[in-house]
Regions:
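An N-terminal assembly and electron-transfer interface module characteristic of large anaerobic redox
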Residues: 1-173
Length: 173
C-alpha cells in the first residue's frame, strides 16, 4: 500500500485518473459507487484491467461521498480507490474523509434537461431563480444559467464549500 496521502480531487474522466495512478505507480485499484451504476463500475474495472491494473470492486451499497469505502479498500491491499458517482466530500471541520488515495469520478446523467427548460421556462413567474442540482446534472448548470439569463431571469446559486465542490450543488445527506 502506498503511504503517500493524496489530496482529494474530482475528475471528469477515467483517463485523467489513469494518468495520475500511472505516475504514482499504483498497481491495485478499488472501485466503489452506488447500486444504480454498478454496470458502469464493472466497465471501468475492465478498462483498468486492460491497462494491467489489478482491480477490486467494493460491492457494498454506497449512498454518497460521505460513505467512502477506504477501510475496505485498504483491507484488500488497494493502492487507491476510485469513488464513482459523487464529488469530493469533507467533514464539516475540514478533515479528509479517508486515509487512502481517493479519486472522485462524478457520474453524469445523459438525460436532455435543456429541452424541458426551453419548453417550460415561460411558466416560471419569478424574476429571480435559484439554480441548484445534484452531482449527476451539475455539468449542465452553466448552460441552464446562460439560457435563463438570456430570457431575462436573474439567476443565483449557492457557493461551494467543504461539503460541495460545485456551485449550487445539493447533497442527499
Amino acid at each position: 500500500m502506498t503511504q503517500e496521502k493524496r489530496s482529494q480531487w474530482n475528475y471528469e474522466s477515467v483517463e485523467e485518473i489513469l494518468e495520475d495512478i500511472e505516475d504514482k505507480g499504483y498497481e491495485k485499484i478499488g472501485l466503489q459507487g452506488p447500486d444504480g451504476i454498478k454496470p458502469q463500475i464493472i466497465d471501468y474495472a475492465e478498462q483498468l484491467e486492460e491497462k494491467g491494473y489489478d482491480t477490486v470492486i467494493i460491492g457494498a451499497s454506497s449512498f454518497g461521498a460521505c460513505g467512502i469505502a477506504d477501510e475496505k479498500a485498504e483491507r484488500m491491499d488497494a493502492d487507491a480507490l476510485i469513488h464513482i458517482g459523487h464529488t469530493r466530500f469533507l467533514h464539516p471541520e475540514g478533515q479528509d474523509m479517508d486515509d487512502l488515495n481517493v479519486y472522485y469520478l462524478p457520474y453524469r446523467e445523459d438525460r436532455d434537461l435543456m429541452s424541458v427548460l426551453e419548453e417550460h421556462y415561460d411558466e416560471i413567474e419569478e424574476e429571480t431563480l435559484g439554480l441548484v442540482g445534484v452531482t449527476q446534472y451539475m455539468d449542465r448548470a452553466e448552460e441552464a444559467r446562460e439560457f435563463l439569463e438570456e430570457k431575462g431571469y436573474e439567476v443565483v446559486e449557492g457557493k461551494t464549500g467543504l461539503r460541495t465542490t460545485e456551485p449550487g450543488q445539493v447533497l442527499g445527506c
